[in-house]
């Protein structure tokens, strides 16, 4: 059955990577195939932690999507972008830096796709007022979103998958990855002038930007206060997980439920933000990966990787980091991480007696998150941004994105390698 499981998975992966077929349909078709043949049973799918659907991931995404959907109704994201542009006093470079920081922070608290969807429209507005090219700003923002998303458990879907499989908490991500993300963001800001060159703007255009009223962006102040209160409670519960022992997925669902009750929005308004295609895609993917786990394919790969690295935790971590970045750049990092987590879990189990056994998990998360910047299809946020740019009449080619993204990815992965080496293999010994 292992040959059947591998054949179905590889075929589905190729179709997903081609971006020519609906990826949700492919994932669900592949899932149906491994069930019908049958490689995996319904009990494995719904109840097994190792081979089934990861319900923690699904419900965390549902909860956060609803929370973000309600928050979107307030106009707070548009307010923040306009505020940043005015504080920069019309300077293109300063505007870019502030929007990069806003994008990174928003991605850490929400997710990078949502951040791009919310920040990009205002970026287009500001660039139109300044009469400057939007492509540089949009690319800088999506780079920052993918980097910032690495900082927290909820910032990027790959992190959610890693956390669920490895048993890592919101605090673990804050403690281990946020310091590196800050360093990488500083490096990104430092290379922005070299990446995009000098951008000039006329004085009267600056006056137009300064005339924008960010206060008008807020559409519902009462709802904004309610959202703020619920978000404080949600993130407090994330941070208090070691004490409360409440799963992040349950916290997100409770927060979403509270906002549904207090917001007064209709069902269509708060459910419209739930990306059902994404959730079904995850479910299908988990089932196909579960088939690989059940048939022993993942176990065999883990043992082969252990032999390649001699079972050394340092070599294993750097192998995962080095492989994850380019692969995540070629294909979407979500299916890649869903495939790799059982493999890394097996590797960690084999090397359980060594110190710093969480390091391969951090290497996987960083490689996937930062590698998403490599090409235009490396992360879902990139695809969304390209669509926005195309509709705005400023299309970005695959290779234009890749030339810039390759530089950002190389710098990010180099800093990640140094960080992992120093923090987990030098300073701890």
Curated annotation (Swiss-Prot):
Coiled coil feature spans: none
Fetch the InterPro entries from UniProt. Arsenical_pump_ArsB (IPR000802), Cit_transptr-like_dom (IPR004680), Diverse_Ion_Transporter (IPR051475)
Compartments annotated for it: namely: Cell membrane
What is the designated name of this protein?
Uncharacterized transporter Mb2703
Its placement in the membrane is given as:
Multi-pass membrane protein
Q: Does the keyword Repressor apply?
A: no
The membrane-spanning stretches of this chain are: 26-46, 51-71, 99-119, 135-155, 173-193, 223-243, 278-298, 311-331, 361-381, 407-427
**Pfam families given in the database record:** CitMHS
Q: Its Gene Ontology molecular function terms?
A: arsenite transmembrane transporter activity
Record's family? Belongs to the CitM (TC 2.A.11) transporter family.
Q: Which domain of life is it from?
A: Bacteria
**An example Gene Ontology cellular component term from the record?**
plasma membrane
């Amino acid at each position: 059955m292992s040959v059947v499981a591998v054949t179905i998975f590889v075929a589905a992966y190729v179709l997903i990577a081609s971006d020519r077929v609906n990826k949700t349909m492919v994932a669900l078709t592949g899932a149906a195939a491994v069930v019908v043949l049958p490689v995996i049973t319904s009990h494995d799918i719904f109840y097994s932690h190792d081979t089934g659907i990861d319900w923690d991931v699904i419900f965390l995404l549902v909860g956060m999507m609803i929370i973000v959907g309600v928050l979107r109704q307030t106009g707070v994201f548009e307010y923040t972008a306009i505020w940043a542009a005015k504080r920069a006093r019309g300077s293109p470079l300063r505007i870019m830096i502030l929007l990069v920081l806003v994008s990174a922070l928003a991605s850490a608290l929400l997710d990078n796709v949502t951040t791009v969807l919310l920040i990009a429209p205002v970026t287009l507005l500001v660039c139109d007022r300044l009469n400057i090219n939007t492509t540089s700003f949009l690319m800088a923002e999506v780079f920052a979103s993918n980097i910032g998303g690495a900082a927290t458990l909820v910032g990027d879907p790959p992190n959610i998958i890693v956390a669920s499989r490895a048993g890592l908490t919101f605090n673990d991500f804050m403690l281990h990855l946020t310091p590196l993300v800050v360093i990488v963001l500083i490096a990104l800001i430092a290379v922005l002038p070299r990446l995009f060159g000098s951008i000039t703007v006329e004085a009267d255009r600056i006056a137009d930007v300064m005339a924008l009223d960010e206060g008008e962006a807020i559409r519902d102040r009462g709802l904004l206060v309610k959202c703020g209160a619920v978000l404080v409670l949600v993130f407090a519960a994330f941070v208090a997980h070691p004490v409360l022992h409440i799963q992040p997925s349950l916290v997100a669902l409770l927060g979403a439920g509270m906002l549904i009750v207090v917001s007064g929005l209709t069902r269509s308004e708060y459910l419209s933000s739930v990306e059902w295609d994404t959730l079904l895609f995850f479910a299908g993917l988990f089932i196909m990966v579960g088939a690989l786990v059940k048939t022993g394919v993942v176990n065999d790969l883990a043992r082969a990787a252990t032999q390649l690295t001699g079972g050394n935790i340092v070599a294993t971590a750097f192998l995962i980091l080095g492989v994850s970045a380019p692969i995540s750049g070629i294909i979407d990092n979500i299916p890649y991480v869903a495939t790799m987590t059982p493999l890394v879990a097996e590797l960690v189990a084999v090397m359980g007696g060594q110190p710093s056994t969480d390091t391969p998990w951090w290497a996987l998360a960083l490689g996937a998150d930062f590698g998403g910047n490599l090409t235009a299809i490396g992360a879902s946020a990139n695809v969304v941004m390209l669509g926005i740019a195309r509709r705005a009449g400023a299309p970005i080619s695959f290779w234009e994105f890749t030339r810039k993204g390759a530089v950002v990815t190389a710098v990010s992965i180099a800093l990640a390698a140094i960080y992992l080496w120093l923090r987990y293999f030098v300073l701890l010994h």
